[in-house]
Amino acid sequence: LVFRVMKINQNGFREYDARWLFEKDIDLEGITDLGKGLGTQIIKHTKKTNPRVIVGQDYRSYSEKIKKALTEGLVSTGCNVEDVGLALSPMVYFAQFNLNSDAIAMVTASHNENGWTGVKMGIKKGLTHAPEEMSELKEITLNQKFTTGKGSHKNIDDFKKIYIEDLVSKNKINKKIKAVVACGNGTAGIFAPEILRGIGCEVIELDCELDWT
């Protein structure tokens, strides 16, 4: 018997993003192919040889290495990747405006339980992939119709601070509010309490320490 290890399950391409069980439905090589597919798509739509792409990741134990594999794929097509690190999805969307980049890719499986991974993607500012873009990405990736180029990677240090300062500066409350902030030991734990205190809330933290277990 010959067993074929599926490195990228086509069912992971959904209408508005992509989700897989890591290692069962997709491996790191599959993630790199996804990066190549996305990079090819971004270059096609922006008509740029070296488009700038913001990447970030959530706080799952394996998200950093998935982001690294995705980045390898993006860079191989010619994309210049700018990495904001540990992030919330809205922070990555904000970064596209703030840094005036061409596209975004956020490694996250949102509310899905541990074991899942995925990517939220967008090219036009403020818009994530819709069914048409997801269908195109699936076709490029599964058929390996990849562009090749020479891209780059750099880290954007302390972007979390820029994001929080922007939110706090634009939002202040006059009425004293006491807020219990329960973050389930997820990524929001290093954002929500600080932001709410910054706009004037009294915050009681519950499970705000990062813990991927």
Predicted regions and their residues:
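An N-terminal, well-structured beta->alpha segment
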Residues: 6-72, 76-77, 156-177
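Active-site flanking residues adjacent to catalytic metal/cofactor-binding acidic residues
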Residues: 16, 57, 107, 181-184, ...
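Ferredoxin-reductase
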Residues: 47-125
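Gly/Ser/Thr-enriched, mixed-charge loops and adjacent short helices
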Residues: 117-213
